Amino acid sequence: MSMRIGNETFKQAVKTELKDDFMRGAVSSAQDRLRERKLKTQEDLGNWEEWRDHSEEIRQHTLANLDYYLNMLSENVAAKGGHVFFAETAEEANQYVQKVLRDKNAKKVAKSKSMVTEEIGLNEAMEAVGCEVIETDLGEYILQVDDHNPPSHIVVPALHLNKEQIEKVFKEKLGYDKSSQPEELALFARQKLREEFLSADVGVTGCNFGVAESGSFSLVTNEGNARMVTTLPKTQITVMGMERLVPTHEELEVLVSMLTRSAVGQKLTSYVTTLTGPRAEDEIDGPEEFHLIIVDNGRSKILGTQFQSILQCIRCAACVNVCPVYRQTGGHSYGSIYPGPIGAVLSPLLGGYDTYKELPYASTLCGACTEACPVKIPLHDLLLEHRRVIVEEEHMSPVAERLVMKGFAQGASHSTLFKYGTKAAPALMSPFENKDKGMITKGPKPLQAWTNSRDFPMPDDENFRDWMQNRLKRGAK
């Protein structure tokens, strides 16, 4: 899988997703549940806004000194016996991993959940050199067994499937013969995955945060699979987006606390693991060889721009969990492994406007995402800035839209045109009026996008100017 999901545009995908009542119900239920849990743990923490301010300061400071902390991280990883590779592109990262796999004659890779590896299409690259890749996060494992069904949520990848659908997948693909009870499904998956952990040659993980002062990296999970991936295979590969680091363990403590509360509404996840390099001589477990791949893949081009604050993201999906557009369309409609508001901002920056120019418009600009963000990214402002760039700099807005807006600007800028335009509007729109409703129920382009889902009011026969003049003639003040 790579960053792009499917071949449909956002508008095309939305038409399909809006008809999927189960998906919309599942997303709504999950959003409500996750949001309520987040609010509860926020209250338990107390002074939530102060924690947000502090988290924002940590992320802004780190980004402002990113070269310094990346250098510190790489030096400390190397000092602990690890190997560090800076990958400018997805291709460079994948080629490095392929080389490690070939050198180790690896046949099986156990992998924990990672958005950056999805972004660069690492699974396909590993399979291309003859490796069997096993996703060990339960949600990702379900999707992999289900013919590589793409994830629909950053934190809960199989959000769009219910337990009956998962039972069917396990029965058809793995010979499962028990019920659809979540406990039995999870136990079955656990037994299957235990075999994979024990036979894997290489373990691959993402990274929630790298810690510059010690050369460590942290993994936050509820299932414990990341610990298995990082302790059983002899070779360990960690892939990290270049912005995903903190200066010290003190900052790590703050951001992990914010991450777990914002992502799943927990004070702390079941497992918070911090690992540092390969195993030492006096240690009995852990990898014999450790590789850290630091991925740029377009991130350095965001630094120093008006979009830099998006790199503060800690991948908690709090913005996704409050987004009204995601609530109705689900994750697959975005065509990116990054859905919701974070995806609508980040995807055009990493994947380009040619592919993702629709996503900044997949927003009501209500600002709920900005209010939910634990590191105070101004998401709705960034979406507006994307729209400005698309129209003013990239000139990529639809031709019909440009013509309509140009015509409106002309009319609104000249009083005579505006006067006669408003007088003529009722007559011009009359052929499209539904006489029974007194509304336009099926309008011409570009009104069709509106009238396909709601009615459009008919212009009043008496415009405001005429109404005001008549009122003044009657002596009204």
Swiss-Prot record:
Q: Which Pfam families match?
A: Fer4_8, LUD_dom, LutB_C
Positions with a binding annotation for [4Fe-4S] cluster 1: C313, C316, C319, C373
State the name under which the record lists this protein: Lactate utilization protein B
* 4Fe-4S ferredoxin-type domain mapped to chain residues: 304-334, 353-382
Q: Which organism is it from?
A: Macrococcus caseolyticus (strain JCSC5402)
Q: Where is this region: Disordered?
A: 443-463
- Its Gene Ontology biological processes? lactate metabolic process
Concerning NCBIfam families, the annotation shows: LutB/LldF family L-lactate oxidation iron-sulfur protein (TIGR00273)
- Top-level taxon: Bacteria
Q: Which family does it belong to?
A: Belongs to the LutB/YkgF family.
Which terms are listed as keywords in the entry? 4Fe-4S, Electron transport, Iron, Iron-sulfur, Metal-binding, Repeat, Transport
Where does the chain bind [4Fe-4S] cluster 2? C323, C366, C369
Q: Which PROSITE patterns match?
A: 4FE4S_FER_1
Protein encoded by which gene = lutB
Q: What does this protein do?
A: Is involved in L-lactate degradation and allows cells to grow with lactate as the sole carbon source. Has probably a role as an electron transporter during oxidation of L-lactate.
Q: Which GO terms describe its molecular function?
A: 4 iron, 4 sulfur cluster binding; metal ion binding
Q: Please name the InterPro entries in this protein's record.
A: 4Fe4S_Fe-S-bd (IPR017896), 4Fe4S_Fe_S_CS (IPR017900), FTHF_cligase-like_sf (IPR024185), Helical_ferredxn (IPR009051), LUD_dom (IPR003741), LutB (IPR022825), LutB/LldF (IPR004452), LutB_C (IPR024569)
